[in-house]
Regions:
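TOPRIM fold recognition
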Residues: 2, 22-27, 34, 38-178
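Glycine-rich, flexible N-terminal cofactor/catalytic loop recognition
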Residues: 1-12, 17-25
């Protein structure tokens, strides 16, 4: 029996839909590429109001672009992230290439980004070494299930999740990076 997913999952294309529906009882909205049009945004907004939405785009630049557009236009969507190494073939990257276990892990650890009051200052972010050291940043992103990202995006996502300096220090200590 396939696991039922209440929310509607936003994906990039038909192959993503086919893969998810092979493993899960779920409905999807396909964006059809990285130029998300207003009609698609309106469908996603309606779905968010009625059933909730999980944005599950590919772990690449176009996927991040789509995710950013949707999050800016439709508040309080859940976001599922899958690591690039769990969603690729030798030539391609995408949700459709992931194993069932990895897809489920990503869906279980969705995060919601909200309009935020700053919980972490830029100075604290720099002091933590998250601007210059991709390794630290990757560790934090992985632990919080927010997908790998550059410094600016990481700073924004941490604040949107109301993460404080103490929370990051605790995560780094668990990984013995201090």
């Amino acid at each position: 029996m396939r696991t039922h997913i209440q929310e509607i999952i936003v994906v990039e294309g038909k192959n993503d839909t086919n893969t998810l529906q092979r493993y899960f009882d779920c409905d999807t909205i396909e964006t059809g590429g990285d130029q998300v049009n207003q009609k698609t945004i309106d469908r996603i907004a309606k779905a968010q109001k009625t059933r909730g939405v999980i944005i599950f785009t590919d772990p690449d630049t176009p996927g991040e672009h789509i995710r950013r557009i949707i999050n800016q236009n439709v508040p309080d969507c859940k976001n599922a992230f899958i690591p690039k190494d769990k969603a690729k073939t030798p030539k391609k990257v995408g949700v459709e290439h992931a194993r069932k276990e990895d897809l489920w892990h990503a869906l279980e650890h969705c995060v919601t980004f909200s309009n935020y009051q700053q919980s972490l200052s830029w100075e604290e972010f720099i002091d933590l070494g998250l601007v210059g050291d991709a390794r630290y940043r990757y560790t934090i992103c992985e632990k919080l299930f927010i997908g790998p990202c550059n410094g600016k995006t990481c700073f924004k996502r941490l604040n949107q999740m109301n993460v404080h300096k103490e929370d990051i220090l605790k995560l780094l200590k668990e990984e013995s990076y201090e």
